[in-house]
């Protein structure tokens, strides 16, 4: 896992899966972050949040534009590993005991129904909504006690960035086992109810999901994109400086 724009990211999908499987099989606990323009920007503004992001087991690149920018800088074949795709790949394995945490009861009920069509065992797995609260005000001990009682291999967390990454970091000390994934809107995408939906397939093929997100939730996403674009020149310059230093040190 390399450090790009001051954040740890693993671009090798096989390596990502290897880290996750190893943690699950060895009953390790930890969390996985999905890096895109929003949480990358926050990680470059907030040092504590940066520490949380870089304290994960592994981070994936959930932004196709971000992957292209870094591929251009480093002249390597970097590609994104979209959280929604990783989520479905693990559901389709029909192997692990899972726990679904966060979002609303309506979303969770529909999510259970849809995922159970892929893996019938999911019908009896735990789906737990969370109240709307500041990340400092959750009862982490009580949440962890319910998770520990179920002993899941995987805990999917749907709170949205940056809240979900901070939440996972705070919950981690109370867990006995389980790999947490903070993947935001994947519950909404797969529940197929509510206002938040995944982009049409043609937009996914052309790596335009970011544009669909801006159209779908402009008040939320356009300011995030603007913040990232304002930070981008400095990040690119710093990345080039780091790359030059590495090349000078390489025999």
Question: Language-model segments: which ranges?
Answer:
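A transmembrane-helix-recognition feature enriched in membrane-embedded lipid enzymes
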Residues: 67-68, 198-251
């Amino acid at each position: 896992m390399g450090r790009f724009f001051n954040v740890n990211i693993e671009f090798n999908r096989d390596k990502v899966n290897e880290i996750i499987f190893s943690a699950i099989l060895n009953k390790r606990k930890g969390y996985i972050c999905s890096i895109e323009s929003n949480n990358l920007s926050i990680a470059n503004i907030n040092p504590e949040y940066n520490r949380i992001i870089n304290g994960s087991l592994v981070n994936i690149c959930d932004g196709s534009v971000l992957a292209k920018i870094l591929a251009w800088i480093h002249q390597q074949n970097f590609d994104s590993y979209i959280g929604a795709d990783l989520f479905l790949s693990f559901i389709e394995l029909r192997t692990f005991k899972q726990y679904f945490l966060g979002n609303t009861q309506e979303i969770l009920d529909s999510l259970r129904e849809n995922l159970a069509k892929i893996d019938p065992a999911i019908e009896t797995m735990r789906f737990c909504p969370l109240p709307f609260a500041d990340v400092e005000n959750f009862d982490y001990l009580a949440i962890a006690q319910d998770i520990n009682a179920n002993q899941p291999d995987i805990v999917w967390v749907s709170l949205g960035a940056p809240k979900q990454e901070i939440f996972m970091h705070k919950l981690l000390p109370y867990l006995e086992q389980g790999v947490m994934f903070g993947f935001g809107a994947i519950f909404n995408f797969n529940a197929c109810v509510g206002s938040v939906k995944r982009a049409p397939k043609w937009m996914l093929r052309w790596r335009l999901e970011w544009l669909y997100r801006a159209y779908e939730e402009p008040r939320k996403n356009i300011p995030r994109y603007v913040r990232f674009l304002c930070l981008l020149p400095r990040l690119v310059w710093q990345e080039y400086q780091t790359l030059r230093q590495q090349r000078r040190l390489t025999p």
